[in-house]
A protein has these predicted regions:
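Extended, folded cores of ATP/NTP-driven motor/assembly subunits in large transport
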Residues: 1-431
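P-loop NTPase motor domains
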Residues: 73, 80-99, 106, 110, ...
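Hydrophobic anchor at the beta1->P-loop junction of P-loop NTPases
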Residues: 469
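Conserved P-loop NTPase
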Residues: 755-811
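Hydrophobic positions on the alpha1 helix immediately C-terminal to the Walker A/P-loop
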Residues: 480
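Conserved AAA+ ATPase "SRH/arginine-finger" region at the nucleotide-binding site
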Residues: 518-522, 737-746
Length: 813
């Protein structure tokens, strides 16, 4: 190789001197290859080099960033103590990042067109008798949707930026940073997750295509990593808008939309923790960005000391001037004294408290369809800033840098900074209230009273979908249950069964095409308490659970305060095993046992304890209350079934509710086999928890329901009685949904202690209007308002106010 090189060198022609024209030509080619440093395409303007599938983004040679999405927490409704805890956790959050890590907090409110209401709410025309109700329901939801601000999707992100030698080093460091960040969000109660590359691109696409949110038919983000190689495109081609225009000094254009970026001048001595929330409540597309970079602690202390030294020098100069002028040297300019005291306080905080110093750049970007709308949006935000003694100032001649600095990439080209301590920085609280706006079979439950956003949730997605509804008479308790029942029938294929002690649900059930079963001594509709099916239990022997029900029933009719004795339980269980043998040998309806068979099996044992139970059963077999001593005559195949037990009277009401609950369990086990859920609504639920044995059986059913696709809901106007039951803990632990309306003073106190409700939250169930209260779902607590338009057919079906019910009946007649 060396010899070849030598021969080449020997034969090479001697270099000649380039002419001036040749040098100019080469210099022109080099300049053209290097470019002029300006972006010539939309893609060139987007300030990053590479986006990787794991979400790591390379901004330039050594700078990398990752983005984490986080959700809201109930800060505004929290108690002062909880707010203080969140504030302290925010301080720890920022203190956890050293000066080598850039932090960008992004709060976005962007309009997104959801398309037709029927697609959003799942209410579709079926061409049947329920279409008028569907149209009515869709109109009501449309009305509530327009009242709220659900067209605007609010999202929150934090983008972290570091420098590293290469990709491997960046990934290794981010692995630690991500874990720490997610843990800090968890401490604050905020759910968070790291965005992957596609999610980050979709986020950027949404910001760079602001007009697409108003066009449901187009503009959706479409991308796959496998498309890059065959197409020869880069990731920027999938997110780039049609055009950027930065020809004006105070505005810019993205495609057909107008935008403007402003910065916040923090001139107030103190900032209120509501300022961020109020920025996000203004109308229009808004993106609030905070670029935060920590200052080395030693450098921060030196900087403050230099400032104090400068202020002291100014103080001495003022004092000398005072002496020369012949007035008191202790009289100093007020600003000088104020700044001097503030600087010393900051120094003390840095040296003795857990305070650090940060540089903050605060940007606010607006987008609108016209310049006029843009100026209105900017002026609204400026008014918010002015309310808190700050100034929102437009970036002159820096709109492009402002836009690129607002993108959640971790890049800050705007060097307008304000130095703040940790406590001063954490006052910009990014939390307001949690939202519930779920997909799937989500149904309407009112508007969030804090944000005015619609509440859409799917109880079946919860770990335990069981629910409770609390409310005083006239608070809207029954109407809330009716509204939920209506939307279940209109938007799902699930079954619904109602236990109606006061005959309040019959008109609604009939209008929705359901079946009303009236249970009373004079009725010919019979339900056999001893009905069973082979799927009655998930255990091998379905009689184990059925025996529990029979024990509960016998204890209820015997009225023993101390409960059944051990021998009594034994003889009942023995009789149960015997009477079901013919049915399991030949499972035909005529072989199903009835209460008379149970009584005979008890008497056949010939012992006093069995005779005592049989004598208690005699009233329900041969006496005046023999209504339940029949085989079932009703066919419960309708999707919507209402058991009207008002006619049972006082003596039969509790047994009737227990028997209905067991009948529901039978239905649940049957429907699970075909993959269909069964919702069960029981009013006056506290009656089932008054007696020890019926309470134990109800709690057991409550636990079993969720495993079998059942969704029970207990409603009561007497939460005090409900909460005094020894089984209430089992009920509450298996109920992730609580709909709490107005409460009496005594009940409020008990509920607050039991459910951990703060005084601020309790105000929403104190003398509240009908349809207003608190909603508990999983770990979320939201105040809600459910004001239905009254001039609709659906409202007339839902209302239980006597005057409105009477008026509706007269109108129908």
């Amino acid at each position: 190789m060396q010899a070849k090189t030598a021969r080449h060198e020997k034969t090479a022609k001697p270099s000649r001197k380039l002419t001036r024209a040749e040098r100019k030509q080469i210099e022109a080619v080099v300049r053209q290859a290097k470019g002029d440093g300006k972006a010539h395409t939309v893609q060139d303007s987007i300030p990053f080099r590479n986006m990787f599938p794991d979400g790591l983004c390379r901004l330039d040679g050594r700078t990398f960033s990752k983005t984490i999405a986080f959700e809201d927490v109930n800060y505004r409704l929290a108690s002062p103590e909880d707010q203080r805890d969140i504030f302290e956790h925010l301080c720890d959050f920022y203190n956890g990042y050293d000066p080598t890590i850039g932090v960008q907090v992004s709060l976005s409110s962007r309009y997104v067109e959801h398309g037709p209401e029927e697609d959003l709410f799942g209410i579709h025309s079926q061409g049947d008798d329920l279409d008028p109700i569907r149209e009515d329901a869709a109109g009501i939801l449309r009305f509530q949707y327009e009242r709220g601000s659900n067209g605007y999707v609010k999202t929150k992100y934090v983008t972290l930026t570091i420098e590293a030698e290469n990709l491997a080093a960046a990934r290794a460091r981010f692995a630690r940073i991500e874990t720490d960040t997610l843990n800090r969000f968890k401490v604050m109660g905020a759910a968070a997750h790291v965005l992957d590359g596609k999610e980050r691109l979709e986020l950027l696409h949404g910001i760079l295509h602001p007009a697409d949110g108003r066009r449901p038919e187009g503009g959706k983000f479409a991308f796959d990593w496998d498309w890059l190689a065959p197409s020869g495109l880069s990731v920027k081609d999938f997110i780039a808008p049609s055009s950027f225009h930065f020809g004006e000094t105070r505005t810019f254009r993205i495609g057909e939309m107008y935008g403007a970026v402003s910065f916040l001048q923090i001139t107030a001595p103190e900032i209120h923790d509501r300022i961020l929330a109020e920025f996000m409540e203004t109308e229009g597309n808004i993106l609030v960005t905070m670029h935060i970079r920590g200052i080395n602690q030693n450098e921060a202390i030196k900087m403050v000391k230099r400032k104090i030294t400068d202020l002291d020098a100014m103080k001495i100069a003022e004092q000398k001037r005072a002496v020369r002028s012949g007035y008191d040297m202790d009289i100093l300019p007020s600003d000088l004294a104020t700044y001097g005291g503030a600087a010393k306080t900051i120094l003390q905080d840095l040296q003795s408290r857990n305070e650090r110093m940060f540089n903050l750049t605060f940007l606010v970007m607006h987008m609108a369809e016209t310049k006029q709308k843009l100026e209105i949006a900017v002026s609204q935000a400026a008014s918010v800033a002015q309310t808190y003694n700050c100034l929102l100032t437009r970036l002159d001649f820096q709109q492009e840098d402002g836009l690129m600095s607002s993108l959640p990439l971790g890049l800050n080209r705007i060097k307008i900074e304000r130095s703040l301590t940790t406590s001063a920085l954490a006052v910009f609280v990014p939390f307001v209230t949690q939202e519930l706006f779920m997909g799937g079979d989500a149904m309407y439950y009112g508007l969030n009273a804090l944000s005015n956003n619609m509440i859409l949730l799917d109880r079946k997605q919860s770990r335990s979908p069981n629910g409770l509804v609390f409310g005083t008479p006239g608070s809207g308790k029954s109407m809330s249950c009716k509204r939920e029942i209506t939307f279940i029938i209109l938007t799902t294929k699930d079954n619904v069964i109602i236990c109606d002690p006061e005959d309040e649900y019959s008109p609604l059930v009939k209008r929705l095409g359901g079946q009303v079963i009236r249970l009373s001594p004079s009725s010919t509709d019979y339900v056999n308490p001893l009905d069973i099916n082979l799927n009655y239990s998930d255990e091998e022997n379905p009689l184990a659970l059925k025996s529990d029900f029979v024990l509960s029933f016998c204890e209820l009719i015997m009225g023993s305060k101390t409960g059944l004795e051990a021998i009594e339980k034994t003889v009942i269980d023995r009789a149960v095993q015997k009477i079901y043998q013919p049915y399991f040998a030949d499972p035909r309806p005529e072989n199903m046992p009835i209460l008379g068979d149970l009584m005979e099996a008890l008497l056949a044992q010939g012992i006093p304890e069995a005779d005592r139970v049989a004598q208690a059963l005699d009233l329900y077999v041969n006496g005046s209350l023999n209504f339940f001593n029949h085989r079932t005559t009703v066919d419960i195949r309708n999707r919507l079934v209402c058991f009207d037990i008002k006619g049972l009277g006082k003596n039969l009401k509790k047994p009737g509710m227990l028997i209905v609950q067991d009948a529901v369990w039978n239905t649940v086990t049957i429907k699970r086999a075909i993959g269909r859920s069964t919702w069960y609504f029981v009013d006056e639920f506290h009656l089932l928890l008054k007696e020890e044995q019926t309470a134990a059986y109800s709690a057991e059913i409550w636990k079993r329901f969720r495993k079998w696709g059942g969704v029970p809901t207990g409603a009561t106007q007497n939460p005090k009685d409900l909460l005094s039951s020894p089984e209430i803990e089992n009920i509450l632990e298996n109920s992730d949904f609580i709909y709490m309306l107005n409460q009496a003073a005594g009940d409020r106190k008990i509920l607050a202690e039991r459910l951990g409700i703060s005084a601020e939250q309790l105000a929403y169930v104190t003398n509240s209007e009908p349809g207003h209260g608190l909603l508990f779902f999983n770990n979320v607590i939201l105040p809600f308002a459910d004001d239905f338009p009254k001039d609709t057919e659906l409202y007339k079906l839902l209302t239980t106010k006597p005057s409105e019910v009477e008026h509706a009946a007269e109108t129908e007649a």
